[in-house]
Curated annotation (Swiss-Prot):
GO terms for cellular component: extracellular region. This is Bowman-Birk type proteinase inhibitor B1. Serine protease inhibitor. Weakly inhibits trypsin (Ki = 167 nM). Does not inhibit bacterial subtilisin or mamallian chymotrypsin. One of its GO terms (molecular function) is serine-type endopeptidase inhibitor activity. It comes from Hyacinthus orientalis. The record marks 14-15 as: Reactive bond for trypsin.
Length: 55
């Protein structure tokens, strides 16, 4: 399958993507994203590799 991009994430940490989308999107280097059930669109990056997150 194709890897999603995280163009619409508004905040990222070393292991997390916080996205405004309903679909998990990972920044380049974040190979997999999985939703964390917190009531917010919070996604945890799995198989993390160093990436940059522009504001």
């Amino acid at each position: 399958g194709q890897q999603p991009l995280c163009n619409d994430c508004f905040a990222c940490a070393r292991s997390l993507c916080i996205c405004g989308d309903l679909v998990p999107q990972c920044h380049e280097g974040c190979q997999q994203c999985e939703k964390v059930d917190t009531g917010k669109p919070l996604y945890q990056c799995r198989s993390f590799e160093d990436y940059q997150c522009a504001n």
